[in-house]
Amino acid sequence: MNCDTAQPWMMSSYHPSTTSDVFWTTTPSSTSTTPSSDNGIQQYSSISTSSGYAPANSPAKTAEVNQLGGVFVNGRPLPFEMRCKIVELSRQGTRPCDISRQLKISHGCVSKILTRFSENGTIMPGTIGGSRPRVTTPKVVEYIRSLKRSDPGIFAWEIRDRLISADICDRANLPSVSSISRILRNKNGGNSSSSSSSQLRYIRDQLAEQQQQQHLQQHQYMEYNNNELNQISGNLDYQVSSSNTPPSYDSYHFIAN
């Protein structure tokens, strides 16, 4: 077949739109060949904008479809309007599972937003990226240890309540139960310098004790040998006389041939 020959599908009256704005329809057309997932992505783009139009030059976002049929962007927080809707439905008595099915949002996302609202009173998302700031400051660690020393049978969740009642921490920087348990298990509090110095001190004490025992054993051995020699010399009754001593010479005396 000659590729240069015009085919019937090339002679159709379809012409692409030249307008700068594209309107995303919510109902798929009968002649459209776009998959259903693409329609969902287009619907999400129309919802995200204030008007019903999405600029053609807007950057493309990678959207995905969850198991409930809802569209989300991985790594991005839920829109503020959806967060408000979740809280409103929860105040009306709707269960989180029903909210999840109604809004097509995962149950974990709904539970996390409601938990954050009940604890901190906010529906705003946390920081995107980065790590959580350290909450186990030396002051908090020392207070936790003091509570454990005063009451050895106290639980970690009781320590969390004590930290809030004593104004040591608030809901934002309150350490978790696992962090408190880790602090209680680690008696040195993660202070590697103090642990290393204590180990060196213990080694020095052990070496000093060993040296002292060696000196004591040597002293006892020398005393035993001296006693044995005194007994032997007493039994022989050997007396040193002037005749038994060898002659002494001056340092400058020598014998000539």
Swiss-Prot record:
**SMART domains in UniProt:** PAX
* UniProt-listed InterPro entries: Homeodomain-like_sf, PAIRED_DNA-bd_dom, Paired_dom, PAX_fam, WH-like_DNA-bd_sf
Main localization (coarse): nucleus
Q: Where is this region: Disordered?
A: 26-58
**According to the UniProt entry, which residue ranges have a biased composition of type Polar residues?**
38-52
Classify the source by domain of life. Answer: Eukaryota
User: Which Cys pairs are S-S linked?
Assistant: none
Q: Which chain regions cross the lipid bilayer? A: none
Q: Where is the composition biased (Low complexity)?
A: 26-37
From the Swiss-Prot or TrEMBL record, what is one GO molecular function term?
Answer: RNA polymerase II cis-regulatory region sequence-specific DNA binding
Q: Which GO terms describe its biological process?
A: defense response to Gram-negative bacterium; regulation of transcription by RNA polymerase II
The subcellular location is: Nucleus
Q: Which UniProt keywords apply?
A: Developmental protein, DNA-binding, Nucleus, Paired box, Transcription, Transcription regulation
Region RED subdomain: which residues? 139-187
Concerning PROSITE patterns, the annotation shows: PAIRED_1 (PS00034), PAIRED_2 (PS51057)
One cellular component term (GO) for this entry is: nucleus
Q: Does the keyword Transcription regulation apply?
A: yes
Q: What does this protein do?
A: Transcription factor. May play a role in pharyngeal cell differentiation. May have a protective role in response to infection by the Gram-negative bacterium Vibrio cholerae.
Q: What protein name is recorded for this chain?
A: Paired box protein 1 homolog
